[in-house]
Amino acid sequence: MAKKKKQKTIKLDAEIKGILFITIGVLSLISIMSSSNSGIIGKMSKKILVFIFGLGAFIFPFFIIFVGVCLILKKGKVTYSGKFYGIVLFILNTLFCLHIGDIVTKGLDRSFFQGIVDIYNSETFLHGGVISYIVDLPLYKLFGKWGTFVIFISIYVICFILISQISLYSIISKFKLKKEKRRKEKNIEIKEDVQDEVKFTEIKDSEEIPEEKIINRIKIIDFIKNTNIEENDDTKENKPIQKGKDSNNIQGEKDINKELEEEMSKAALKTIDYEFPSIDLLNDNKSIKLKKEDKKELLNNANKLEETLTSFGVEAKVTQVTKGPSVTRFELQPSVGVKVSKIVHLADDIALNLAAQDVRIEAPIPGKSAVGIEVPNRELTPVYLKEVLDSNEFKNCNKNLAFAIGKDIAGNCVVSDLSKMPHLLIAGATGSGKSVCINTLIISLIYKYSPEDVKLLMVDPKVVELNIYNDIPHLLIPVVTEPKKAAGALYWAVNEMTRRYKLFAETNVRNIESYNELLKKGKGVEKLPLIVIVIDELADLMMVCPNDIEDYIGRLAQMARAAGMHLVIATQRPSVDVITGVIKANIPSRISFAVSSQIDSRTILDMGGAEKLLGKGDMLFYPSGESKPMRVQGAFISEEEVEKVVGFIKEKQCGEVEYEDSIIDEINTSIEINNEDRDELLEEAIKIVVDVDQASTSLLQRKLRIGYNRAARIMDQMEERGIISQKDGSKPRQVLISKDDIV
């Protein structure tokens, strides 16, 4: 109670003081404005105020009223800022300047007291009062006229700093930046087909960014590049699938198509009758470049990022902002002594301050002394397959199995060579972009290679994904949709691999490239095409016949590269029971789309990160030989575009497609054998008889610990498969295969 009573008393005292100050101020104002009606006290107060302050007497009443109002509003707790003291000093300095003229005019002949008397008897207001006289006279005697003016000017500069709260350093820096900008604007020549760059100084008028941050220079790169570029003669001399850079000139496109047709006709003389599809069958990208508002937003986010890190004690500067199709990467330059791990641990705090869905940190960026912070864009910009196929990266790629992947964050087209991988594993959740990626790979091969150079063996347990490619000349056999037939197709692939190695041994060559070179030298050998085996859903195959599929894939992955056979395996369930150790160890190149958990990401990439991807083609591309995966926005191709390309190929081919009947017969034979009552111990029994090089029912009974009837059935099954010889009286059966023949 006592405390409340004391607080109430303090409040009342402050209000009383405030009212007294306001009253004195109003009376002073009346006395100065109208001395005839202000009484004796009014006339005296006017004389005293004019004597003390001179012209400042008109300001003094307002100052007293202001103090009174502050006492009432602030409850007696009045504190004055630097701006207040700056205003008071400005008024006093103005009075000093006003009065120095009187001292200069009358000189130093009169005495000090005579000067005070002259001020008191003065009938004009145009002087600074006795206060100004007491200050100006010593200054004038010590420093003279010009020295006194220099002091007054310095005081005005101090007043400006106190009132505006702006440092002289920032003003000078701002002037330098403006001068530098004008100089650069005179020297910069505007060009097309360059990455869009802007300096931080371009938005100096923005209220959202502090002026102190303007000193930092941030480079902004937009991944969308201008495509209105004239073609030169070098870009026109390419393969049939290649066209020059995009142009709005229709006549130019017609000329390109004519050249493409001429080159395709030349290629047809050397190969089978195959007409390459036109690039015009694919859709154009109509995305627009960055707007000025988008650039300002990126720079504001860069500023927020620096402030967030500073608040956690991490000193770092943003040196470059790169806007990609799906994410924007902020490149940070940490100060000396800052641990990279400290920045990585702040991922959630950075996402919170930038209002981002999620943040992925790449520390450090390969090849740069910087840390990359990848923030998702508000709107995802698609990358169309036509852009990548029409790029110099794809057109100038002379690899055996070049295919388009997409664009990286900087907007560079990513093209890879399947023959160097040599096998590819693709994983991602439903809807993340796996099927589109497979279509992109297949269409890329169709655009760049003829059926004589590349053959495709497709396995599609989902039935609906790859059936559209039936009846194109690149296929060895129709798309395989039954899981058991898929095992038979892989079994044929293993046999084909073995056959090719035998051919290599006979001709003393080591790989398919050397073997096909013999044909160019005039030696009578058959040309062996490269074979790409595409499996769209591995998980479904592993559920039906896991042992066979794993064994076949493992054998192909280990040995098929030199034979010109390459695997592309996709699955939406990257778990350890689908991507087994054997498969994972032999397929070093991986593409991971968005997955549901970090465990799945580690299964496919051996590291986290895929769980933070955005879907819709956002991927981590991890080719063999690289230390870290690369973030890429996958090229998009619609079903309509696939239908156009496939329809064009079917329309232009002569006659019906001739499939390899021998492959189909071999697959059907293996299916018939597998459809019988196959014992689950058959494989183990085969290994036993091959190891001991003899086969008998009693041997299987002892080794497998089974009864006579089951052992006899296993013996019959091995006989049907040609593993052991037929029964010949009392003679022991012969084992017809060796350890090398076991698949």
Swiss-Prot record:
Binding-site residues for ATP, renumbered to this chain: 431-436
UniProt xrefs under Pfam families: FtsK_alpha (PF17854), FtsK_gamma (PF09397), FtsK_SpoIIIE (PF01580)
Membrane topology annotation: Multi-pass membrane protein
Protein biosynthesis is among the record's keywords: no
Keywords: ATP-binding, Cell cycle, Cell division, Cell membrane, Chromosome partition, DNA-binding, Membrane, Nucleotide-binding, Transmembrane, Transmembrane helix
Cytoplasmic compartment spans: 167-743
Main subcellular localisation: membrane
Gene Ontology, cellular component aspect: plasma membrane
Biological processes per GO annotation: cell division; chromosome segregation
FtsK domain boundaries: 411-602
Ranges annotated as spanning the membrane: 14-34, 48-68, 84-104, 124-144, 146-166
SMART domains: AAA, Ftsk_gamma
Molecular function in Gene Ontology: ATP binding; ATP hydrolysis activity; DNA binding
Cell compartment(s), UniProt: Cell membrane
Coiled-coil region: none
Complexes and interactors: Homohexamer. Forms a ring that surrounds DNA.
Function of the molecule: Essential cell division protein that coordinates cell division and chromosome segregation. The N-terminus is involved in assembly of the cell-division machinery. The C-terminus functions as a DNA motor that moves dsDNA in an ATP-dependent manner towards the dif recombination site, which is located within the replication terminus region. Required for activation of the Xer recombinase, allowing activation of chromosome unlinking by recombination.
Entry's free-text remark on domains: Consists of an N-terminal domain, which is sufficient for the localization to the septal ring and is required for cell division, followed by a linker domain, and a C-terminal domain, which forms the translocation motor involved in chromosome segregation. The C-terminal domain can be further subdivided into alpha, beta and gamma subdomains. The alpha and beta subdomains form the DNA pump, and the gamma subdomain is a regulatory subdomain.
PANTHER family: DNA TRANSLOCASE FTSK, SPORULATION PROTEIN RELATED
Family under the similarity heading: Belongs to the FtsK/SpoIIIE/SftA family.
Name of this protein: DNA translocase FtsK
